[in-house]
Amino acid sequence: MPRRKKKVKEVSESRNLEKKDVETTSSVSVKRKRRLEDAFIVISDSDGEEPKEENGLQKTKTKQSNRAKCLAKRKIAQMTEEEQFALALKMSEQEAREVNSQEEEEEELLRKAIAESLNSCRPSDASATRSRPLATGPSSQSHQEKTTDSGLTEGIWQLVPPSLFKGSHISQGNEAEEREEPWDHTEKTEEEPVSGSSGSWDQSSQPVFENVNVKSFDRCTGHSAEHTQCGKPQESTGRGSAFLKAVQGSGDTSRHCLPTLADAKGLQDTGGTVNYFWGIPFCPDGVDPNQYTKVILCQLEVYQKSLKMAQRQLLNKKGFGEPVLPRPPSLIQNECGQGEQASEKNECISEDMGDEDKEERQESRASDWHSKTKDFQESSIKSLKEKLLLEEEPTTSHGQSSQGIVEETSEEGNSVPASQSVAALTSKRSLVLMPESSAEEITVCPETQLSSSETFDLEREVSPGSRDILDGVRIIMADKEVGNKEDAEKEVAISTFSSSNQVSCPLCDQCFPPTKIERHAMYCNGLMEEDTVLTRRQKEAKTKSDSGTAAQTSLDIDKNEKCYLCKSLVPFREYQCHVDSCLQLAKADQGDGPEGSGRACSTVEGKWQQRLKNPKEKGHSEGRLLSFLEQSEHKTSDADIKSSETGAFRVPSPGMEEAGCSREMQSSFTRRDLNESPVKSFVSISEATDCLVDFKKQVTVQPGSRTRTKAGRGRRRKF
């Protein structure tokens, strides 16, 4: 496709643009940029090729820039450190110059825009200032000054430093706006600027501006001078730049920063202005800043005083109360003793009361004590009944004895005190249960405990003879409670813990009192002969294992095999054990012949039948570990018998030895089993004599073969 480039037209357009730029100086830089951009535009006939050409130009530009960067990097790499340092200094100087030049250009543009806005807004400002009065103090007179001189405004903006315009925002051409305020004069009609150090006034025609505002404010708050000055800004929403204003105060009064309606109307009309607040923040309109600061200071003082008062209250420490000690629920008389002590304290406070009042108090206290004991007795008996009913199991027989104790204590409520009945219940309950702090509830095996009939007989024998003793204990308790509380607790502990209240150690199966069982358990290393203490989980697992073994025995009854030595039927499980025992008996008793073997087999069969009759008794005697071992060994033995056709020798289990073999045979078999166990059947290489392979010759290898193999490996890895 043909392409045409119109450079002549572009040159003429650029000349026209330069003429227009001379007329409008504000848009020179923008139009120059446009002119430079237009110079690179290529016009073509086809519309579809324009984006492709633009993309090609961009690619070429990026390539050129990348090449230039690469060349610069190469040059920098070839330069020495001193040359690189000098180049960095030059670069930083250039950047600083560019930044400074940009700031200067922005300041010049701002000044020009402000001057143009002042020239455009001058007539409206003049009319507003003519119709607007200013409120002054009572002793001063308000004067108005019409600002019609344009040179004065230009001089004002020349005096304003450029730092005030840096934070201003320009938008939509309306960049800034300033209005001259009329000046309030006192009887002296001269305009005088404020000096920061003293309150004197210098006669001059220059007005006061915002750059002196902070100093004059600080001076006015410190001491009241005759003539002060304040710049009062106003709030208005919109965009624009800084709004500057100065107000000169009156003679005798303090300074007044009063807003005017005309200013607000003018601001709302023009819009696009941002007013900056100088001095106190959040000062409302129409309020004296001095009074406002005094209010803030007063609030701060009140706040500090309230803080100090609150901190003083925090320093007062509160006294600690009496310690709360744990008590067993069975000791009712301790509670009664505490009630008596509290009542005695109250009596000590009111010592001036008469004897009649004391007697009445004692009677009321006795009635309260009786009602408390009855209520506590009933509630404790009910709660213990519920707990015991929940905790008793069908396999144990101690639940009946506990219920019988509860019934007897309820019948003997008149003679026996409530503390003793509750103590008896807790003692029996401690036999049933271990302490509650344990994670699982551990129950005692019923074989080690007394039956229900024996407990009834013992209590019937003890109860009539021990009533007098219990009454004596109660009298001793009542006497000692007031004097010494600790001795009373010891007496109750001794009376409640009877000789039968002993806990058996689960390791060595020895009985100890509850106070010594913990110390003994810490150092006990003994092994228990029988599992007398079983948890609920252990009992459940034990019952499951017993039921499983019983089912297996019932299934295996039908599987009997004939022994060809003694010609008797032997169950399938114990066949191997029976054959081995018969062989040993035949070797040992060669003179007896088949008679001795027949006796041995008859004894074996009798013991096996006894084992089938009482599987539950065996389950009680054996522990959980033995039952699991028996199950696992039965399974492994069955698998071995099915797999082996030649009937190799099998290690018998301890349960099978108990049921099928005599004691003499057990001793011989245990020795044989230990010697011929699979663990000890393995022999080390050095001790192997009957082996077909000579391991010693295999171990010694020639060093040359090793080196060759290593070399071969290395060659293989290389390839």
Curated annotation (Swiss-Prot):
Keyword annotations of the record: Chromatin regulator, DNA damage, DNA repair, Isopeptide bond, Metal-binding, Nucleus, Phosphoprotein, Repeat, Transcription, Transcription regulation, Ubl conjugation, Zinc, Zinc-finger
Give the domain of life.
Eukaryota
Task: Give, from the UniProt record, the effect of changing residue 101 to A/E.
Answer: Slightly impairs the selectivity for 'K-63'-linked ubiquitin
Residues covered by the UIM domain:
80-99, 105-124
Query: Gene3D superfamilies, per this entry?
Result: 6.10.250.1800
Region Zinc-finger-like region, annotated ranges: 505-582
Basic and acidic residues bias locations: 9-23, 359-378, 614-623, 631-643
**Domain comment?**
The tandem UIM domains form a continuous 60 Angstrom-long alpha-helix and mediate binding to 'Lys-63'-linked ubiquitins. UIM1 and UIM2 bind to the proximal and distal ubiquitin moieties and recognize an 'Ile-44'-centered hydrophobic patch. Since UIMs don't interact with the 'Lys-63' isopeptide bond the UIM-linker region between the 2 UIM domains determines the selectivity for 'Lys-63'-linkage, and its length is very important for specificity.
Q: What is this protein called?
A: BRCA1-A complex subunit RAP80
Per the record, the gene is UIMC1
